[in-house]
Amino acid sequence: MAKEALELKNEANKFLKEGHIVQAIDLYTKAIELDSTNAILYSNRSLAHLKSEDYGLAINDASKAIECDPEYAKAYFRRATAHIAIFQPKEAVGDFRKALALAPSDPAARKKLRECEQLVKRIRFQEAIHNTEPPSPLANINIEDMDIPSDYDGVILEKQITKEFVEDMKERFCQGKKLPLKFAYSILRDLKELLEKTPSLIDIPVKGDETLVICGDTHGQYFDLLNIFKLHGPPSPTNKYLFNGDFVDRGSWSTEVAFTLYAYKLLYPDAVFINRGNHETDDMNKVYGFEGECRSKYNERTFNIFSETFSLLPLGSLISDSYLVVHGGLFSDDNVTLDQLRNIDRFSKKQPGQSGLMMEMLWTDPQPAPGRGPSKRGVGLQFGPDVSKRFCEANGLKAVIRSHEVRDQGYEVEHDGYCITVFSAPNYCDSTGNLGAVIKVKEDMELDFHQFEAVPHPNIRPMAYANGLLSGM
């Protein structure tokens, strides 16, 4: 490796270790420009892309490293990890096998290959049993006959949820306590019944003295969610909330966040709204921690019922005919209309898959360049400012509001104002140092941005319940 390229690599490694990912990628890129045949440089940049969640770019760089040196085990390991991150375990198995063949004494490669093979077997088994529509996980449960544990000292959940119960539940969660299964199942059942009557695109009017608080990703950061309520008031009939997906996974209080949002939705069904994000899906939950958290804190049935409710969540919201709010972004087709979004049959499809309107609503990202481009994530696509403008003008919208990506300041107005990103998980995964933000909207439809910092939380690391295949990213 040329001396200057080596110096750039060493400096980039330092930035990466300190969590300054953008600077690290920039320096790796400069080093590659000086030495474009060095596998280590591509592999290191692949790791940086893994940390920034640009999994498609991570796969590309790992593949380039393999082209430069087909015997470089770490590159296969990086590529396998990126495939796992976008739930492509079958592709990952081959790379883990190659990494282990090249480094047979590496215990990490051996362990991850075994876990990946087990995951593939599990997927195949589930595919085999799901050829026919499985019964609801709520079937054959008589919730009313379930017992409440004798040591439960909280407010009792009656037939109708109450503000007293919700406030007590929130406080108990702060103390590390769980819901009795009777109450957990009751909340999930009632929420399921409510969502079954909800369209795929919901209309949210904001009138008179009402305020709507739009929140982006919260990702299991329960104590930051409570801080949002402290700063902007809890949900109420006049203080509405819209949560724009990705409220589970990564953070280690995802069940607490989910039950809190669901309880508020039941308490104020016309004032609390929840869009589906790409992490309210089975594939992501198996890898990023929510399934593991449900199993640890409750049981497998609890996860299966959550999964059923996730498949019923609306895919988008329309605020006073002015702003479309979706988790990911816009579409591969310029001619998509709001009526098409309303008519999506989310009840039969359930999971977003790899193509189609549902997938694009959950996965796509904006790009600075005009037109459309491949996704840096490896799923979906990227859309430019001209795409945003055409969509808004064709559908009579002021802008599209989306989430799905960290922003250093918690939000970003993009595409000449036609695309706005809001992200509400400050210091995401305890590592990025970003601010969180929410958007407040009143009847005049002016957007009011509010930023906030992370608050302390108990000493449980992010991804504590995640699949071990992602460790070391």
Curated annotation (Swiss-Prot):
Q: Please verify whether the record's keywords include Metal-binding.
A: yes
Record-listed Mn(2+) 1 binding positions: D217, H219, D246
Please list where the region (Catalytic) is annotated.
159-472
Q: Where in the cell is it found?
A: Nucleus
Q: Give the E.C. number(s).
A: 3.1.3.16
Question: Gene3D superfamilies this protein is in?
Answer: 3.60.21.10, Tetratricopeptide repeat domain
| Pfam families with a match to the protein in the record | Metallophos, PPP5, TPR_8
Question: What SUPFAM superfamilies does the record tag this protein with?
Answer: Metallo-dependent phosphatases, TPR-like
What is the UniProt remark on how the cofactor binds and its stoichiometry?
Answer: Binds 2 Mg(2+) or Mn(2+) cations per subunit.
What GO MF terms are annotated? Answer: metal ion binding; protein serine/threonine phosphatase activity
Task: Name one cellular component (GO) term.
Answer: nucleus
TPR repeat positions: 5-38, 40-72, 73-106
Q: Does the keyword Repeat apply?
A: yes
UniProt-listed InterPro entries: Calcineurin-like_PHP_ApaH (IPR004843), Metallo-depent_PP-like (IPR029052), PP5_C (IPR041753), PPP_dom (IPR013235), PPP_phosphatase (IPR051134), Ser/Thr-sp_prot-phosphatase (IPR006186), TPR-like_helical_dom_sf (IPR011990), TPR_rpt (IPR019734)
Catalytic reaction annotation: O-phospho-L-seryl-[protein] + H2O = L-seryl-[protein] + phosphate; O-phospho-L-threonyl-[protein] + H2O = L-threonyl-[protein] + phosphate
UniProt keyword list: Hydrolase, Manganese, Metal-binding, Nucleus, Repeat, TPR repeat
Its family remark reads:
Belongs to the PPP phosphatase family. PP-5 (PP-T) subfamily.
Job description of the protein: Protein phosphatase that specifically binds to and dephosphorylates the molecular chaperone Hsp90. Dephosphorylation positively regulates the Hsp90 chaperone machinery.
Q: Which PANTHER family match?
A: SERINE/THREONINE-PROTEIN PHOSPHATASE 5-RELATED, SERINE_THREONINE-PROTEIN PHOSPHATASE 5
What name does UniProt use for this protein?
Answer: Serine/threonine-protein phosphatase T
Query: What is the source species?
Result: Schizosaccharomyces pombe (strain 972 / ATCC 24843)
